[in-house]
């Protein structure tokens, strides 16, 4: 037996017991005739003591020679520490070591294996196996494990079956780019890695598996952000004989179960619901952060037509009221202006107005507006003395709202209104079924081609497709879309109509999705579902800024795994075996 206990379990109740521990040397300290070694494993850290007054000199000499991250086994007696460490669970005890074996030496690690490390992102990604030894990273993996267990426990209790679907599937042109896999046995043909198990879970509904789930890897070849990776994990679910209300109730229940069991937060009230239209109107985003208010107020009637050309020519003027921010200095306001003018935001500038202690309003465009008009602005914004009004305008309604959204989030962060330990959950519902692309002059499915329109909007498919609302819904927590889904189309004729509106010829629709259309001919039940992003849930509960920190071996922002150096070139023999030839990139 290599060990009798772990480095995180010994307490005062174990005093005088002889134990054997294994782990990695965190640090070595020498004080007089004593050497202290912090020994670490997955479970915690325990202090080892080598005392020259009671232990063999040869053993103490070897202890002094130990290096960081050496792997050792130590046997000794559990003793009470004279100088306790309240910061760790094992801080009341130490091990007086009588025997020690070095199981493996280590080179000096390229960065310190501590929560507060000196290693940069790139270096830690290259040596991810060392980064995973850090407690803060390891705890994210443990959180992920516990969440996956609770997901399975909840869904099993609700009668769901976990069914695995294929990883090598057919490529479809809609949505993000596919990762493709050449087939050696079928020259010139390719599989795709699934962006989601969407069509397979619908086929399972046709098969009679009325409640399905799986925790599944999905793949999308798209530009990366803090909340995106080329491969990610979904909690994928589907239900038969349900309406939207049934799906929302089931998965709101799962969210509450996770809050209760993982975060120990009890949520009794129902999640509020907001239409997509209201989310865009008041927050400029279909995933609004509702931890704080600061809703948009349209100001066209108040500010247009007063000789200020920027506003007079605008298609939209919107403002937010930052409560208590009237003390912002000119330097802070200039920094906010620079923020909205960054290419990532794209605004041309920002106008501000502050409400003074006497109720008067002082603005950055005073020469264009009378105090009477500024007081009307104050009333419209419901601003009080000490408040700050921030205003953006533009000639594109949706674009300007998105810019105002970025400003709102930035100000919310500056004012401490986005506490990671406070959670605000809601459903966003009634999405548009289609979105119009000006460049290609065609409709695209806002979610996917299998989303059902609201029954009362079906007649609009022939007259005004852009006005059709979808039976779709997203769960949003703290401005993060943690999951989304829809009621699916289960009628072949309606599905065919959907394909036509999306620009599919009957031949193309049959080529891409004929297997699903054929299945619908054999009695497809009404069905719907949802997919949660497990990575996003974990990062939310862990208070992380990026999902990368809750994935064991993530890719960097260029989609590369710098640890194993992937993607990489393959041998010419492999290319020939796959009947592939590389064309030089002239760029």
Swiss-Prot record:
Chief location bin: cytoplasm
SUPFAM superfamilies per UniProt: Class II aaRS and biotin synthetases (SSF55681), GAD domain-like (SSF55261), Nucleic acid-binding proteins (SSF50249)
This protein's GO CC annotations: cytoplasm
A GO MF term: ATP binding
Binding site for ATP: 220-222, 229, 481, 533-536
PROSITE patterns: AA_TRNA_LIGASE_II
One Pfam family cited in the UniProt record for this chain: tRNA-synt_2
EC number: 6.1.1.12
InterPro entries for the chain: Aa-tRNA-synt_II (IPR004364), aa-tRNA-synth_II (IPR006195), aa-tRNA-synth_II/BPL/LPL (IPR045864), Asp-tRNA-ligase_1 (IPR004524), Asp-tRNA-ligase_1_N (IPR047089), Asp/Asn-tRNA-synth_IIb (IPR002312), AspRS_core (IPR047090), GAD-like_sf (IPR004115)
Biological process, per Gene Ontology: aspartyl-tRNA aminoacylation
Domain of life from the UniProt record: Bacteria
Region Aspartate: start-end pairs: 198-201
Keyword tags: Aminoacyl-tRNA synthetase, ATP-binding, Cytoplasm, Ligase, Nucleotide-binding, Protein biosynthesis
Cell compartments where the protein resides: Cytoplasm
Gene3D superfamilies named in the record: Bira Bifunctional Protein, Domain 2, GAD-like domain, Nucleic acid-binding proteins
Subunit record text: Homodimer.
Function: Catalyzes the attachment of L-aspartate to tRNA(Asp) in a two-step reaction: L-aspartate is first activated by ATP to form Asp-AMP and then transferred to the acceptor end of tRNA(Asp).
Record-stated family: Belongs to the class-II aminoacyl-tRNA synthetase family. Type 1 subfamily.
HAMAP family on file: Asp_tRNA_synth_type1
Name the record gives this protein: Aspartate--tRNA ligase
Originating species: Porphyromonas gingivalis (strain ATCC BAA-308 / W83)
């Amino acid at each position: 037996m290599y060990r009798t206990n772990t480095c995180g379990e010994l307490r005062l109740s174990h005093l005088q017991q002889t134990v054997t521990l294994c782990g990695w040397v965190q640090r070595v300290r020498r004080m007089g005739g004593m050497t202290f070694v912090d020994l670490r494993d997955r479970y915690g850290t325990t202090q080892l003591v080598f005392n020259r007054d009671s232990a063999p000199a040869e053993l103490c000499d070897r202890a002094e020679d130990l290096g960081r991250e050496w792997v050792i086994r130590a046997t000794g007696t559990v003793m009470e520490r004279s100088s306790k460490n309240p910061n760790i669970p094992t801080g009341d005890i130490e091990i007086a070591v009588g025997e020690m074996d070095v199981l493996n030496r280590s080179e000096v690690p390229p960065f310190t294996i501590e929560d507060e490390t000196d290693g940069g992102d790139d270096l830690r990604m290259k040596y991810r196996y060392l980064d995973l030894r850090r407690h803060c990273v390891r705890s994210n993996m443990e959180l992920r494990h516990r969440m996956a267990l609770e997901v399975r426990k909840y869904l099993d209790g609700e009668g769901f079956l976990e069914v695995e679907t294929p990883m090598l599937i057919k490529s479809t042109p809609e949505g993000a780019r596919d990762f493709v896999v050449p087939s050696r046995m079928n020259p010139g043909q390719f599989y795709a890695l699934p962006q989601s198990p969407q069509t397979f879970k619908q086929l399972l509904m046709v098969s009679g598996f009325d409640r399905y789930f799986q925790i599944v890897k999905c793949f999308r070849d798209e530009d990366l952000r803090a909340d995106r990776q080329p491969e990610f994990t979904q909690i994928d679910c589907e239900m038969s004989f349900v309406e939207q209300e049934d799906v929302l109730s089931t998965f709101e229940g799962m969210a509450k179960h996770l809050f209760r069991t993982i975060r120990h937060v009890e949520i009794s009230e129902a999640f509020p619901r907001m239409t997509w239209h209201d989310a865009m109107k008041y927050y400029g985003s279909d995933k609004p952060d509702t931890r704080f208010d600061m809703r948009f107020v349209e100001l066209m009637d108040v500010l247009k037509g007063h000789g200020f050309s920027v506003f007079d020519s605008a298609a939209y003027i919107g403002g937010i009221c930052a409560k208590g921010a009237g003390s912002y200095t000119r330097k802070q306001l200039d920094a906010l202006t620079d923020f909205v003018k960054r290419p990532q935001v794209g605004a041309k500038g920002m106008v501000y107005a502050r409400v003074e202690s006497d109720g008067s309003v002082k603005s950055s465009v005073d020469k264009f507006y009378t105090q009477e008009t500024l007081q009307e602005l104050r009333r419209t914004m419901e601003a009080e003395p000490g408040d700050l009004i921030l205003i953006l305008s533009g000639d594109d309604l949706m674009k300007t709202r998105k810019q105002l959204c970025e400003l709102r989030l930035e100000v919310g962060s500056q004012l401490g209104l986005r506490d990671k330990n406070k959670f605000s959950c809601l459903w966003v519902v009634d999405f548009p079924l289609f979105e119009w692309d000006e460049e290609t002059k065609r409709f695209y499915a806002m979610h996917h081609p299998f989303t059902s329109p609201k029954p009362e909007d079906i007649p609009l498919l022939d007259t005004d497709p852009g006005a059709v609302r979808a039976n779709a819904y997203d769960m949003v927590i703290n401005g993060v879309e943690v999951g989304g889904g829809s009621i699916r189309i289960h009628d072949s004729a309606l599905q065919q109509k959907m394909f036509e509106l999306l620009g599919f010829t009957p031949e193309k629709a049959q080529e891409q999705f004929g297997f699903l259309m054929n299945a619908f001919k054999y009695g497809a039940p009404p069905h719907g579902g949802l997919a949660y992003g497990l990575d996003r849930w974990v990062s939310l509960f862990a208070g992380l800024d990026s999902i990368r920190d809750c994935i064991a071996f993530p890719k960097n922002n260029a989609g590369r795994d710098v640890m194993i150096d992937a993607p990489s070139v393959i041998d010419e023999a492999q290319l020939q075996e796959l009947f592939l030839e590389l064309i030089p990139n002239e760029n």
